[in-house]
Structure formats: C-alpha cells, structure tokens
Amino acid sequence: MKLGIIPYQEGTDIVYKNALQGQQEGKRPNLPQMEATHQIKSSVQGTSYEFVRTEDIPLNRRHFVYRPCSANPFFTILGYGCTEYPFDHSGMSVMDRSEGLSISRDGNDLVSVPDQYGWRTARSDVCIKEGMTYWEVEVIRGGNKKFADGVNNKENADDSVDEVQSGIYEKMHKQVNDTPHLRFGVCRREASLEAPVGFDVYGYGIRDISLESIHEGKLNCVLENGSPLKEGDKIGFLLSLPSIHTQIKQAKEFTKRRIFALNSHMDTMNEPWREDAENGPSRKKLKQETTNKEFQRALLEDIEYNDVVRDQIAIRYKNQLFFEATDYVKTTKPEYYSSDKRERQDYYQLEDSYLAIFQNGKYLGKAFENLKPLLPPFSELQYNEKFYLGYWQHGEARDESNDKNTTSAKKKKQQQKKKKGLILRNKYVNNNKLGYYPTISCFNGGTARIISEEDKLEYLDQIRSAYCVDGNSKVNTLDTLYKEQIAEDIVWDIIDELEQIALQQ
C-alpha cells in the first residue's frame, strides 16, 4: 500500500482478504449513529414519521465534501474505493445537508426540520449533468391551505380600502411566518445549505405558498394556472440540460475569450509609458500583477475538458472511513473584461436548458430557462492560490532539450531559457460532481418526500408521452442516474488506481 494511506483495521474495515474466491459478498458500511429530533404526523395520510439527525459523521461544509469509502485490497496503491450507505434507492444525501435538517429514520426520501427552525436545505445524492430528468416531491407538511382558500376567496372580491385598512394583508403575512413551509428546486455545489434554495445565483427554487420562482433572491411570477400548495400535493420537476458535448464546446469558447481578455489586459500593463511612470513599490506591484495574470492564463490553458480529476484522500473519522475532497467555491468576477459583452452574458447561459413544473400532473410552465453553465472554467475548486502560484514560479524546470551533444553549460542556459512553471494542481477541473442537484428547503416544521423510483412516480408516463416524441428524446429518473453514478465511480476508482500504478513504474 502506498506510503501515507491509512492502514486497514481487520475488525472494522470491509476487507475480504481471507474470503474464498466466488464467496465474496458485497457489503456497504453501516449507517451512522442517529439521534431522534422530532415527529411529524401527516394530516392527509394520518401517518406519523420519526426524524433523526446523524451523529459522529462529517457534513459537507467549509468547502470540503465527504462520502463513505471502503477498504479494497485489490487496490494495492490507493487502498480504498467509493461506496454508499445501504439505502435501496436514491434520495436526499446524508452528508450533503444542513446540520439542522433531519432525515427519516426509515429511509433517505423524507426531510424535515423541527418547529421554530429557520430555513435548512438538503441536496439529493444524484448529480444531473445532461439530458432530461424527471422527479416528484410530495408535500407532507407545508404550504398553507387556509391561505390558499383566502387567496381564492379574495379573487372573487374587489380590493377595497376598508379591507386594506382592516389589516388583512398583515394577518396573511403573520400566518405565513407562523406555519410550515417548503421550497423546492435545483442547485449547484456552490449553493449554501444554510439558506433556502434560490437564495443565491447558484440555485433555482419554487415557493410553496404562491409557486413563485426564486433565483438570486428575486421573486418572479412566471407559472400560470397554479394554486398554493397544500399537504398531499405532488410537484413534478422536469430538468432539461444540453449534452455534455455542447457544454464542453461552450466552455472551450469561453476559455478562449478569457485568455484573449487576459492577454489584452497584460499588454496594457506592460506598455513602456506605464513602466516609466511606475517606480519603486508601484513597479513591484505591477510586476506581481503581471505574474498573477500569467498564472491565471496558464491555469486556463491547462484545462482538460474530457478528464475527471478526483483529488480525494481516505480518512478515518471516529472509526468510520470517508473520502475527503475540496468542494467548489463561489467564483468572483475576473479583474479584467474585454469589450465583448458576450463574455459576461451569452456565455453564462446553457442554451435550451429549462426547469418545467407540474402540479399534480398539470403543466404549469417553465419556471426557469437558460440556466447557468457549470463546467470549468465556470466552476472552480477551493484553491490555495498563493501556494500553487509559488510552486508555478519556482518549481523544477522542464527539460525540453533533446540534444545530447550540447555542452552542459549551453544545455543549462537553454533549459533556463525554456523554463516553464509546473502546475501542481489546477482549480479548473471536473471531479465528476459538477451538475445540478434536486434540492429541498424546509422551514418551521416543513416536511417533504422526494420520489425518485420509476414505479412510484405517479405522472412519469404522462411526462414521457408528452416529451418523448421521437427516438432521440429520453426522460431519465433519479434512480436511473443514481445507478449510473455508482457505475461511474467504480470505473474512475479503477482508472485512478491504474494511473498511480503507471506513475510508480
């Protein structure tokens, strides 16, 4: 096993060294310890649900992500491979959620928060990268039936001054804040889990009280013929994203424009009149800014669009095995801009992408269109830029001279002349987790169930008959993508092991 990899513990780790060939049974790690938080009783179904909170496991926060892993003695160098908790199907992630949000004791499809809790959010364990995907969310506790009835009655009456003065709107506002609520939608890795989905630019959400669309914290009424949700309602989501090939083509074009803008900015900084004007500390600062821009250009030129880079390490936390990796962070606008406005507008949209909404099988419309792209360089990992910039400046030089007859002094001079910085690690990489995640946010006792299995999706056949009009169209379910995701993890585990073996030779 590679030096630095944590050793196995035969009594607790999942190791099959002594198992006979053909008798090795796959086993997933046990669920972590659970602490009971509260109970919810559905007024529609009359069923009580018990909710728990996990103990002694790390949650995804502070730009670090975790997932369970298992010992694999067939991986002689890496030693460990990806695994999942023993759930029967996809659902809400155990680790990719706010600490204040609870999950059902009996499965991973129900999420809730206790009464008097503010907004808490959880993401699904399925990453949607391309194509059309459909899922449903059932309201267990949320919405506001009284408010919905009040709105319907209000539509049949005229707004009078007396009604406004009587404080009807203030009463409605208080009623909204004192009742359970939900928000649903999709978000990216960068979205905060301590705020409702749609709070920032990385999420797209729907309100349960009015079915308003929320993005960047702004409300929009784009859905038609919808009514406020009540318990028992099922909201259908159809997310359509362009193919990975189309997204890569867009990312490449955007990278070219950013490199061109960087070069133009650097040419302006290096003009002779500016060097003469800048002296002393200002000249040193100018040189440092130029070096930083050169490093940014090197990172952009180093992007591998078709590769997956998973910089994850196995750790043992309270006698449990996890993979730890850095997560994607919120990106800031570059310090440079070209005169082409498309750098900031057209290339920040996924063409023909949308999120369509259905209420109990009834089509309400497209809540969002032209979603934000996510492949590098639109997304970037947490990155110690100062450290990697220093390595790029002072790292070992690449020996690009193939002339064996060259004298050592001349060869050394050529080597210094052709010296190039080494990029130890790039922040513009795809770790196979870039995509949009189905998301649920709960408030003040709000409770919802995500439905991902094909046989439990009540309106799936209706959706497929409407959207699969030709042989090229296909509507996936979350459970199907979940199984494909597991298969991809196995493949990339093997590829990572083979790459490490090749590096050792």
Swiss-Prot record:
<keyword id="KW-0779">Telomere</keyword>
<dbReference type="GO" id="GO:0048188">
    <property type="term" value="C:Set1C/COMPASS complex"/>
</dbReference>
<keyword id="KW-0597">Phosphoprotein</keyword>
<keyword id="KW-0158">Chromosome</keyword>
<comment type="function">
    <text>Component of the Set1C/COMPASS complex that specifically mono-, di- and trimethylates histone H3 to form H3K4me1/2/3, which subsequently plays a role in telomere length maintenance and transcription elongation regulation. COMPASS recognizes ubiquitinated H2B on one face of the nucleosome which stimulates the methylation of H3 on the opposing face.</text>
</comment>
<dbReference type="GO" id="GO:0000781">
    <property type="term" value="C:chromosome, telomeric region"/>
</dbReference>
<protein>
    <recommendedName>
        <fullName>COMPASS component BRE2</fullName>
    </recommendedName>
</protein>
<dbReference type="InterPro" id="IPR037353">
    <property type="entry name" value="ASH2"/>
</dbReference>
<feature type="compositionally biased region" description="Basic residues">
    <location>
        <begin position="409"/>
        <end position="420"/>
    </location>
</feature>
<dbReference type="GO" id="GO:0000723">
    <property type="term" value="P:telomere maintenance"/>
</dbReference>
<comment type="subunit">
    <text>Component of the Set1C/COMPASS complex which consists of SET1(2), BRE2(2), SPP1(2), SDC1(1), SHG1(1), SWD1(1), SWD2(1), and SWD3(1). Interacts directly with SDC1.</text>
</comment>
<dbReference type="GO" id="GO:0031509">
    <property type="term" value="P:subtelomeric heterochromatin formation"/>
</dbReference>
<dbReference type="InterPro" id="IPR043136">
    <property type="entry name" value="B30.2/SPRY_sf"/>
</dbReference>
<feature type="domain" description="B30.2/SPRY">
    <location>
        <begin position="70"/>
        <end position="295"/>
    </location>
</feature>
<feature type="region of interest" description="Disordered">
    <location>
        <begin position="398"/>
        <end position="420"/>
    </location>
</feature>
<feature type="modified residue" description="Phosphoserine">
    <location>
        <position position="227"/>
    </location>
</feature>
<feature type="binding site">
    <location>
        <position position="318"/>
    </location>
    <ligand>
        <name>DNA</name>
    </ligand>
</feature>
<dbReference type="InterPro" id="IPR003877">
    <property type="entry name" value="SPRY_dom"/>
</dbReference>
<dbReference type="GO" id="GO:0005634">
    <property type="term" value="C:nucleus"/>
</dbReference>
<feature type="region of interest" description="Disordered">
    <location>
        <begin position="271"/>
        <end position="290"/>
    </location>
</feature>
<dbReference type="InterPro" id="IPR013320">
    <property type="entry name" value="ConA-like_dom_sf"/>
</dbReference>
<comment type="similarity">
    <text>Belongs to the cclA family.</text>
</comment>
<keyword id="KW-0539">Nucleus</keyword>
<dbReference type="GO" id="GO:0000976">
    <property type="term" value="F:transcription cis-regulatory region binding"/>
</dbReference>
